[in-house]
């Protein structure tokens, strides 16, 4: 850059700082780059798939899926993990369906949890914005977008048509609160439901409620599905769950995590530690026996996981090694390369199919 341009740029930057305050415009190289702070999801596999060890603070996250797929369980698990680190959490219960007893079983400190059960969508989003602007709340859950019913629809007759009201409400609210969320370094999670588009011939007929605004403003979008049942004998005690990261602005997208959700207990974290420990060579498996550092910890996965539950220090040690091994810069770079290759393969498949 020549001297005239440098002087003109310096004058412009000086004027901007005087008018809008210091830091209104910054040169990226003048400041040290910092890792994005994250809050664990409670699932070790999902934390690793997200690339930064959890869900990013200061961002909007959308979690959607069919009924009974584990959406609320996953968000309550996020709250439980955040509270372990002293975070203040809020739950905006637009569905009026939060069960405090179930939340307590998942490890949520219900006594410290802020809960709101708003009457209208406008009220729910205004409360969310006020909590964000307080700069005192670290995690806010909105359950769910489908239940954010505009005031006009509530006050109207049952058969009245209100085209696009909810989409406009979400668009306006997200424009308003996105900047505040970044400034407050607050994680805001919107739970969403799935609907079917009528007359779709090609591609997926599934869509989410509330218009397209949330799709754009969300830094991370998680698609959660129940893929099977967890059984003890003939009794169903939980569900096999798969989460696909369909959008990720902080790490490579399109990665997946699979874990078990046990009824009344939540995410089966010790089972994940055993599986990932074996995959990374940290836990040895010989026949049905599992060993760690030469010591047998159990015959069968259930007994090995029970051993970790009874010896949390060993479980934490294995988990720490897994995180250090899989959340390094090299691992993320390799994942980015793999994700790009996967996306190219999907594009070629779509082209071959004529989409």
UniProtKB/Swiss-Prot annotation:
Residue spans crossing the bilayer: none
Main location: cytoplasm
Protein residues bound to ATP: 65-72
InterPro entries (UniProt xref): AAA+_ATPase, DNA_recomb/repair_RecA, DNA_recomb/repair_RecA_CS, P-loop_NTPase, RecA-like_C, RecA-like_N, RecA_ATP-bd, RecA_C_sf
Database matches in CDD domains: RecA
Keyword annotations of the record: ATP-binding, Cytoplasm, DNA damage, DNA recombination, DNA repair, DNA-binding, Nucleotide-binding, SOS response
Any one biological process term the GO annotation gives: SOS response
A GO cellular-component term linked to this record: cytosol
A molecular function (GO) term: single-stranded DNA binding
Localization: Cytoplasm
Superkingdom of this protein's organism: Bacteria
Family: Belongs to the RecA family.
Biological role stated in the UniProt entry: Can catalyze the hydrolysis of ATP in the presence of single-stranded DNA, the ATP-dependent uptake of single-stranded DNA by duplex DNA, and the ATP-dependent hybridization of homologous single-stranded DNAs. It interacts with LexA causing its activation and leading to its autocatalytic cleavage.
Name the record gives this protein: Protein RecA
Organism: Pseudomonas entomophila (strain L48)
């Amino acid at each position: 850059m020549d001297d005239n341009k440098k002087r003109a740029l310096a004058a412009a930057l000086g004027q901007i700082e005087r008018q809008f305050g210091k830091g209104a415009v910054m040169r990226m190289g003048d400041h040290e780059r910092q890792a994005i702070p994250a809050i664990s999801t409670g699932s070790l596999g999902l934390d690793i798939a997200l690339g930064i060890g959890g869900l990013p603070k200061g961002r909007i996250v959308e979690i959607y899926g069919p009924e009974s797929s584990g959406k609320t369980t996953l968000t309550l698990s996020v709250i439980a993990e955040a509270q372990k680190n002293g975070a203040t959490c809020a739950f905006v219960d637009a569905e009026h369906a939060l069960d405090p007893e179930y939340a307590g079983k998942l490890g949520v400190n219900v006594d410290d949890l802020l809960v709101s059960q708003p009457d209208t969508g406008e009220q729910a989003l205004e409360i969310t914005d006020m909590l964000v602007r307080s700069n005192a709340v670290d995690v806010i859950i909105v359950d769910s977008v489908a239940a954010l019913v505009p005031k006009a629809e509530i006050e109207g007759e049952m058969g009245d048509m209100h085209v696009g009201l909810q989409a406009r409400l979400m668009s306006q609210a997200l424009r308003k609160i996105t900047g505040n969320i970044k400034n407050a370094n607050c994680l805001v999670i919107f739970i969403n439901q799935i609907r079917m588009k009528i007359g779709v011939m090609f591609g997926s007929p599934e869509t989410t409620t509330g218009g397209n605004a949330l799709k754009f403003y969300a830094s991370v979008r998680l698609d959660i599905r129940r893929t099977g049942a967890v059984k003890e004998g003939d009794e169903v005690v939980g569900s096999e769950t798969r989460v696909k990261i369909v959008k990720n602005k902080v790490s490579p997208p399109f990665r997946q995590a699979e874990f078990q959700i046990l009824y009344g207990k939540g995410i089966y974290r010790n089972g994940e530690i055993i599986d990932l420990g074996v995959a990374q060579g940290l836990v040895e498996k010989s026949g049905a026996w599992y060993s760690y550092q030469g010591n047998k910890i159990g015959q069968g996965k259930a007994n090995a996981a029970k051993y970790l539950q009874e010896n949390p220090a060993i479980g934490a040690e294995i988990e720490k090694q897994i995180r250090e091994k899989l959340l390094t810069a090299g691992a993320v770079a390799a994942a980015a390369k793999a994700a790009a290759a996967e996306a190219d393969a999907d594009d070629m498949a779509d082209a071959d199919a004529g989409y």
